[in-house]
Design a protein with these regions (language model features):
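Active-site regions of oxyanion-processing enzymes, predominantly non-cytosolic
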Residues: 1, 21-30, 61, 159
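Solvent-exposed, polar/charged alpha-helical surfaces in well-ordered, non-transmembrane soluble domains
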Residues: 4-7, 11-14, 18, 93, ...
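Generic beta-strand/beta-sheet core signal
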Residues: 32-34, 71, 168-170
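Catalytic cores of eukaryotic secretory-pathway lumenal/extracellular enzymes that build
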Residues: 3-6, 57, 65-69
Length: 191
């Protein structure tokens, strides 16, 4: 059953954190625990999105907001709670900044040579990602990410968030569990 699996999972995460502590590498190890987007409401009450509305495959916050726990003793203050906007791909430049490469996003935009096991290649790409390190360590009060684009599982743009404002372009009006996956989104004439 679901409950037993979660209890077992929690125990395994605890064992891993204990091992990191026992090895004396906690202050040199960033642990990020996260999930994918929103639960399926058909697993209620286990798949709740409280206080957010709805579930996966909708345009509502319950489909996109997720818990994320971060542990880095000595760098990130324990017990901190944040509702700032971040995305999973923000971890790429954040981890590299923690490892001593704080400017990877700018370098990749300009074109950056990377040696991959003796094979040197140039990568020139734009990554929609931000280094979260100054925010996570308390150097700045806000996340560098100010906006978020909401996509459906078919890559349709459902909405756009900027700070606390959200514009919805397509809405999932179906109420309920698996039927949500069968019903199309309703395009709005005006957001």
């Amino acid at each position: 059953p679901y409950h037993d699996t979660m209890i077992d999972h929690d125990r395994h995460v605890g064992k891993l954190l204990d091992l990191i502590d026992e090895l004396g590498i906690a202050e040199d190890t960033i642990v990020v625990y996260s999930t994918d987007n929103g639960p399926h409401a058909n697993t209620w009450p286990d798949g709740a999105t409280t206080p957010f509305r709805s579930e996966k495959n909708t345009n509502w916050e319950g489909a996109f907001r997720i818990p994320e726990l971060i542990r880095w003793p000595g760098k990130i203050k324990a017990g901190t709670i944040s509702n700032e906007i971040i995305q999973h791909h923000d971890w790429f430049p954040t981890f590299l900044a923690a490892a001593g490469e704080p400017d990877i996003i700018d370098k990749l935009k300009a074109g950056h040579q990377i040696d991959l096991r003796g094979d040197s290649r140039e990568f020139k790409v734009h990554l929609d990602a931000f280094n979260l390190l100054p925010y996570l360590t308390g150097e700045v009060d806000e996340s560098p990410r100010k906006g978020f684009i909401y996509f459906s599982d078919d890559c349709d743009v459902l909405g756009l968030r900027f700070h606390n404002w959200k514009v919805v372009f397509q809405e999932q009006r179906c109420q309920g569990t698996l039927q949500i996956w069968a019903e199309p989104f309703t395009p709005l004439r005006a957001p």
